């Protein structure tokens, strides 16, 4: 993990630091995830995010990484089987989200890439097949797009 700290990726995120999730043990700075999920998070960063950051040449900020089930349920629109709960997903943003999305797709190591108006959701499965699914969030849901449409 070259460009992201564990605390940055594994905190159970709230808008303000003092509002971190009170339903899980991640209310303080931590260096280890529950249930041995460290390997998933490290694989996501090492295989997907660090190479993207290297090629992009500018900072990438993590909006949300790991989420405990209670926090995930409180996130509007979050899937009940969200990869955030498995430490397999991050929501990120940078100064050029479109370029970042293209870099991740070109690298070829991702499970799902969802383009939202202000951030990108990216996931990677350390174990099992990765779908290489590219979606765009629309007013009515999600639309599958090709790499050319990014």
Which sequence ranges carry the predicted segments?
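Generic detector of short, locally flexible boundary/turn motifs and exposed helical patches
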Residues: 26-29, 55-60, 86-91
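Extended, low-complexity, intrinsically disordered C-terminal regulatory tails
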Residues: 46-77
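A short linear-motif detector with a strong N-terminal bias
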Residues: 40-42, 69-73, 92, 100-102
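Generic recognition of cysteine residues
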Residues: 12, 21-24, 62, 68, ...
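Solvent-exposed, flexible loop/coil residues
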Residues: 8, 70, 75, 79, ...
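Catalytic cores and adjacent binding grooves of peptidoglycan-active enzymes
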Residues: 80-81, 85-86, 90, 94-150
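Extracytoplasmic cell-surface/polysaccharide-interacting catalytic and binding patches
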Residues: 1-53, 126, 141-150
């Amino acid at each position: 993990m070259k460009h992201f700290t564990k605390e940055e990726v594994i905190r159970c995120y709230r808008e303000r630091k003092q509002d971190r999730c009170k339903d899980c043990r991640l209310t303080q700075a931590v260096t280890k995830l529950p249930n041995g999920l460290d390997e998933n998070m490290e694989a996501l960063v090492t295989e997907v995010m660090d190479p993207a950051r290297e090629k992009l040449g500018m900072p990438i900020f993590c909006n949300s990484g790991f989420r405990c089930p209670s926090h995930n349920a409180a996130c509007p629109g979050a899937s009940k089987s969200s990869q955030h709960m498995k430490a397999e997903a991050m929501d990120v943003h940078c100064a050029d989200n479109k370029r970042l999305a293209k870099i991740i797709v070109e690298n070829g190591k991702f499970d799902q890439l969802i383009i939202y108006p202000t951030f990108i959701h990216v996931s990677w499965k350390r174990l099992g097949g990765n779908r290489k699914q590219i979606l765009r969030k629309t007013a009515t849901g999600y639309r599958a797009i090709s790499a050319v449409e990014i």
